C-alpha cells in the first residue's frame, strides 16, 4: 500500500511539474525604438541640406556631411541618402506602399541609392514623387499609404513615414522654411524586425 501511495504521489508530482514548466518563447530581439519627430528644412533648392541621424534622433551639423554620422539629408522636397554620390555611408531606401504599422520585416536587398544628382533614391518628381503638390495652396502632402524602409549609413534598419509638410509662417511671396513631421521605427541592434 505504501508503494502504491508513493507511486501515486510521484506521478502527481511529475504531472504538476510538467504543467508548471513553460517553454520560454521570449524573443531576444531588441524592440525597435519608435519616435515621432519634426525637422525644419530650407525651402530654397540652392540652400544646404538638413541632415538627420536616426541613431541619435537628431539633426546633424552640415560640417559632418562627409561622414557616416547622418542617414538622410533634406532640402525643399528632395531627399538624399548617405551613400554612393551623396555620402560615404551604406544607406539605401525602398519606397514601400501599404500600411506602415503592418510592416514588420525589412528586406535584405532591393535598396535604391543616389546614383546621380538627378537620380535620387527617393523620387521627388511632381507626378512620380513621394508627395502630392497642390498648385492652388502650394501645399506638399505625403502620398497616403507610402513610407520608406531605410538601411542606415551604418547598416541598421528603419521604417519612416512622413506625416505632414508645412510652411513656417512667412512674409512675402516665397516661403523660407518647411517643417517635416515624420515617425519612424529604428532597430538599434541591426536586426530587420520592427
Per-region residue spans from a language model:
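Surface-exposed, beta-sheet-biased, low-hydrophobicity segments with strongly acidic/polar composition
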Residues: 22-194
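Bacterial N-terminal signal peptides that target proteins for export
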Residues: 1-9
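C-terminal motif of bacterial Sec signal peptides marking the signal peptidase cleavage site
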Residues: 17-20
Amino acid at each position: 500500500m505504501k508503494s502504491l501511495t508513493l507511486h501515486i504521489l510521484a506521478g502527481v508530482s511529475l504531472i504538476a511539474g510538467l504543467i508548471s514548466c513553460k517553454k520560454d518563447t521570449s524573443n531576444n530581439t531588441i524592440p525597435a525604438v519608435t519616435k515621432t519627430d519634426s525637422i525644419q528644412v530650407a525651402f530654397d533648392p540652392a540652400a544646404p541640406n538638413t541632415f538627420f541621424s536616426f541613431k541619435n534622433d537628431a539633426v546633424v551639423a552640415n560640417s559632418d556631411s562627409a561622414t557616416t554620422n547622418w542617414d538622410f539629408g533634406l532640402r525643399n522636397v528632395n531627399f538624399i541618402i548617405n551613400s554612393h554620390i551623396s555620402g560615404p555611408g551604406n544607406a539605401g531606401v525602398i519606397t514601400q506602399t501599404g500600411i506602415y504599422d503592418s510592416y514588420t520585416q525589412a528586406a535584405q536587398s532591393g535598396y535604391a541609392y543616389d546614383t546621380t544628382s538627378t537620380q535620387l533614391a527617393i523620387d521627388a518628381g511632381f507626378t512620380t514623387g513621394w508627395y502630392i503638390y497642390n498648385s492652388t495652396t502650394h501645399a506638399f502632402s505625403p502620398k497616403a499609404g507610402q513610407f520608406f524602409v531605410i538601411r542606415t549609413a551604418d547598416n541598421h534598419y528603419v521604417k519612416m513615414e512622413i506625416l505632414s509638410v508645412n510652411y513656417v509662417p512667412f512674409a512675402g511671396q516665397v516661403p523660407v522654411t518647411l517643417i517635416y513631421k515624420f515617425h519612424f521605427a529604428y532597430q538599434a541592434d541591426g536586426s530587420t524586425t520592427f
